[in-house]
Regions:
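Short Cys/His-rich micro-motifs in 6-15 aa windows
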Residues: 4-5, 28-36
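Cys/His-coordinated zinc-binding microdomains
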Residues: 8-17, 28
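The −1 position to Zn-ligating cysteines in a subset of zinc-ribbon hairpins
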Residues: 6, 12, 23, 178
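Conserved "right-hand" nucleotidyltransferase catalytic core of DNA-directed polymerases
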Residues: 3, 164-165, 169-170, 181-189, ...
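Conserved DEDDh/DEDDy metal-dependent 3′-5′ exonuclease domain
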Residues: 67-176
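Helical catalytic core of nucleic-acid polymerases
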Residues: 156, 169-171, 190-196, 324-447, ...
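Cysteine-rich micro-motifs
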Residues: 20-30
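C-terminal, non-catalytic extensions of nucleic-acid polymerases
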Residues: 324, 474-731
């Protein structure tokens, strides 16, 4: 089995592509006619599986597809062979490739080899600490670069798919999600619940699953070769190991490196320890952040400026909450992520009288800082010169080159980390100076544009505006752009669209003059397998039902009938969708017509909407103790505890004078002071997926049956992206 193919330079394009794809995504050359691509012979992909009575690990040498498997269990002890193998990897300067191997697989493997662990239960306990332990416990178990037996390349870190946010519920992107994104034939999850004591037959099955995961990781590895090469080159250039850095972290480190060369100090020595330099502010006067040349003629924009200038804040969160300006019927929303405004459910078309024009600020936030000498206070004004040097270094590399991309990340790291409590760039006043002025300066351009007779604003976003301009005033708008550039010392880049199809600010299609489409939000459908440089559907994004935006595009751009397009669409994978449930939840397939009979599914599955399936349901545990009253909002812990104690001690057996329906599972009566007004109780929560439609699990692609696809669902969803735009008069 080979994993990387290369097109013939004569009959094809000569480029590399993953061998699991049927055709070259660049030129369409069939895979069977291509040659094997070159893979670094140092790279060995591996993955471990751990249960209370068994440990398995699978290695595959990617370049040759040579495979090894090892087991430590009550029936078999491969520890001596595993130790020898790992030491051979060390001796030949091998590199271990994995998915979350730095955070999990390697720390377990390292301790097994170094401590000669042959007790599967002890190995399992170690693994559980890495999965469920506290931050301190996990940190203590990490193995740093200098101590590793062989180098590690972790793809989850390269792509920054390990990010999580407990507040928003964002979880790391799992390997299973990537299997769906890469369109693997068989998407598999752990075959047995964590903690199960496995039989011999189950252990044999575990080995097969272990190999499946390694192959899936290799598939993702060959799709990551450009990112890996960039990190290897930058590591050599800067003398620092960037191999497992995300783009953001890599950019921050490059910026620090370049500025330190210019004499900028990012760290102090305190008690012989290196301590980050930061600017921590108890409060920020926003009036001091706004540039003195920000002035408005329109009272709506001036009211926003005046309100912001009058504020002194103690935290940046919520500064712009509810802040907007309605100007000539278009609402401009201000936020920490930038300004946003857009017409909705409209189609615009350039014609003999009007032209759609889009202007964006080149490297907006970096140049805003450079031209206005903005910097974190602790870094000093000298930082501005060094930062500008990084900008010019980026400009020296061609667009699309790895170096250009790396220095772009370095430039973005300044603002991106300025509100990060763990960063050497921390200064929230700098953060607010950038985001406040960025939005207000764009509004200054907007208010001059809307004076022009017949000009209509279409959109405003973080770094630019789009407008529908009478052709006789195009040169006048360019003069206004030149005036704005001279005022701000920034540069605007113009693009012209022939048509725009707009659902809202987050979802639209823009057709460039001369061809080419810009697809945003609900209309995006280009996958990274089709174009590695796309930002439409990256590997970490849910690729569900791509036939829907494709049909909408065909209808809007080409006038194709939606149902005709969908029923004749040849790519079966475009009908497939992804369902995902957190590990604490259950995902079940239920059949209401059979007394709600149900079967448990994996926590992430692939499915399609069918005429013959069941109902897909997520089942979540209660957010509190089952059957107890839900706590009202804004009730302090002290108040809640005091009232609860009062209710508990005042109860009479069995329920005092309260009606049985007014007490919860613990016998606590409902009290308006601390409980929700609607007397809701904590219970099992159910959320339907594709409610009202039947679905069929096709995690194994063999279960996809085109004859059972319910085209009505896909047609209906595509119509939601098309019909609202057609009911509004077009321009």
């Amino acid at each position: 089995m080979r994993y990387l193919s290369v097109c013939d330079s004569v009959t094809g394009c000569g480029k590399n592509f993953p061998s699991d794809m049927n055709n070259c995504p660049h030129c369409g050359e069939p895979e069977w006619s291509c040659n094997a691509g070159d893979i670094n012979p140092r790279d060995y992909c591996y993955d471990i599986e751990v249960y209370p009575n068994v440990f398995t690990v699978k290695f595959i040498h990617i370049a040759t597809d040579t495979r090894w498997k090892f087991e430590i269990s009550n029936r078999r002890n491969d520890l001596p062979q595993l130790t020898d193998f790992v030491m051979q990897l060390k001796a030949c300067n091998a590199r271990g490739v994995g998915y979350n191997n730095v955070g999990f697989d390697y720390p377990v493997l390292h301790r097994i080899v170094m401590q000669q662990m042959n007790d599967p239960r002890a190995i399992y306990d170690l693994a559980m600490k890495l999965i469920k332990g506290s931050k301190d416990e996990k940190f203590a178990l990490q193995v740093w670069d200098r101590d590793r037996l062989f180098e590690q390349l972790d793809l989850i870190m390269v792509w920054h798919y390990n990010k999580e946010n407990p507040v928003t519920g964002t979880e790391p992107t799992s390997l299973k999600a990537l299997e769906i994104a890469m369109r693997m034939d068989d998407v598999e999850d752990l075959p047995f619940d964590v903690g199960t004591v496995l039989t011999d037959e189950q252990i044999d099955e575990l080995h097969r699953y272990n190999e499946h995961d390694v192959i899936a990781t290799i598939f993702f590895y060959v799709r990551s070769l450009t990112q890996i090469k960039l990190r290897e080159e930058l590591s050599n250039t800067f003398g620092k190991n960037f191999l497992n850095h995300s783009n953001t972290k890599m950019g921050g480190d490059i910026l620090i490196h370049e500025c330190e060369k210019a004499g900028i100090e990012f760290f102090d020595r305190v008690n012989n320890k290196r301590v980050k330099r930061q600017t921590i502010r108890p409060s920020i006067n926003l009036g001091e952040c706004i540039f003195p040349y920000v002035r408005f003629e329109r009272p709506e924009f001036e009211a926003v400026r005046a309100l912001l200038a009058s504020k002194t804040i103690t935290e940046t969160k919520g500064v712009f909450k509810g802040l907007n300006a309605d100007v000539d019927g278009l609402k401009y929303y201000f936020g920490t992520g930038g300004i946003h405004a857009s017409v909705e459910s409209r189609i615009f078309e350039s014609n003999e009288t009007h032209q759609i024009i889009d202007v964006d600020v080149a490297s907006f936030y970096p140049n805003l800082a450079i031209k206005n000498r903005l910097h974190a206070e602790h870094l000093g004004v000298e930082f501005c010169n060094a930062y500008e040097g990084v900008y010019h270094t980026r400009k020296s590399y061609p667009k699309g080159s790895p170096e250009n991309a790396a220095y772009k990340e370095a430039l973005n790291a300044n603002y991106g980390n300025s509100n990060n409590a763990y960063s050497v760039f921390l200064d929230p006043k700098f953060t607010m100076s950038i985001t406040l002025n960025g939005q207000l300066l764009l509004c200054m351009l907007v208010e001059q544009m809307i004076i022009i007779p017949g000009l209509e604003m279409i959109q405003a976003n973080t770094d630019g505006i789009t407008y529908y301009c009478p052709r006789e005033y195009i040169e006048h708008t360019r003069a206004l752009c030149k005036w704005w550039e001279q005022l701000t010392c920034l540069e605007l880049e113009e693009a012209q669209y022939s048509r725009m199809f707009i659902r809202d600010v987050n979802s639209y299609i823009a057709e460039y003059e001369g061809g080419g489409l810009k697809r945003i939000g609900a209309y995006a459908h280009e996958r990274m397998d089709e174009n590695p440089g796309t930002r439409e559907v990256p590997y970490g994004k849910d690729p569900s039902g791509l036939v829907i935006p494709k049909a909408a595009e065909a209808a809007l751009v080409h006038g194709t009938d939606i149902r005709t397009f969908i029923e004749n669409h040849a790519d079966d994978y475009d009908f497939m969708c992804r369902a995902k449930a957190p590990r604490s939840n259950r995902l079940v397939m239920r059949w209401p017509e059979y007394d709600n009979a149900e079967i448990d599914l994996a926590n992430i599955v692939r499915y399609y909407v069918s005429n013959s399936g069941g109902s897909l349901v997520k089942i979540a545990p209660p957010t509190g103790e089952l059957g107890t009253w839900k706590r009202a909002a804004k009730v302090s812990d002290a108040t809640y505890a005091a009232v609860l104690a009062e209710l508990d001690t005042g109860r009479l057996a069995p329920y005092g004078t309260s009606n049985v329906q007014d007490v919860d599972a613990n016998g606590i009566p409902w009290d308006e002071r601390i409980h929700t007004k609607n007397r809701s109780k904590h219970g099992i929560r159910e959320m339907g997926v594709c409610v009202g439609w039947r679905v069929t699990d096709c995690s194994n692609v063999k279960n996809f049956d085109r004859s059972t696809v319910n085209y009505d669902y896909y047609v209906q969803e595509a119509e939601k992206l098309v019909k609202p735009l057609l009911t509004t008069p077009s321009l």
